[in-house]
A protein has these predicted regions:
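A short alpha-helical element within helix-turn-helix/winged-helix DNA-binding domains
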Residues: 29-35
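Beta-hairpin "wing" of winged helix-turn-helix
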Residues: 54-67
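Short, hydrophobic-biased segments on the C-terminal half of alpha helices
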Residues: 46-47
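Key DNA-contact positions within bacterial/archaeal DNA-binding proteins
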Residues: 40
Length: 145
């Protein structure tokens, strides 16, 4: 499993909105500038997040985007699944109802299923708020005079 640029940028965009939620609607150009991501690229990600009701859009002057819910309501897993489709480490675990033709005889299937569970459990238990809190704690710990 390799997380694409789209997935990483979607996560960074959501984190930026979480960090600036007190600012109300945030312009895409501001997110792009702070995150050093092309505005055009973010424009491709917005519809994915918007369609799934992760973002609220406001058009016109003072327009922009904001999170629909609190940062603690969004997990890394949910954001990455929107942009990546699935997070399975091997193709035989993809959303295929038939599965692999060797499924019943595969000696490594339990290994891949276990890895898939570890990945899902990890990503589904980290929220945007957790990441922000961790970042702030690390920033305070690294402060020196």
């Amino acid at each position: 499993m390799k997380i694409s640029t789209k997935g990483r940028y979607a996560l960074r965009m959501m984190l930026d909105l979480a960090e600036h939620q007190q600012d109300g609607f945030v312009a895409l150009k501001d997110i792009a500038a702070r995150q050093n991501i092309s505005k055009k690229y973010l424009e491709q990600i917005v519809p994915i997040l918007n369609k799934s009701n992760f973002l609220q859009a406001n058009r016109g002057f003072q327009g922009g985007y904001r999170l629909v819910n609190a940062p603690r309501e969004y997990t890394v897993g949910s954001i990455l699944r929107l942009t990546e489709g699935n997070l399975t480490p091997v193709a035989c675990l993809d959303f295929n109802p038939v599965g692999c033709e060797r499924r019943n005889d595969c000696i490594t299937l339990p290994l891949w299923q276990g890895l898939n569970k570890v990945i899902a459990d990890y990503l589904d238990n980290i929220t945007l708020q957790d990441i922000l809190d961790n970042y702030k704690a690390c920033s305070i710990d690294n402060y020196s005079i």
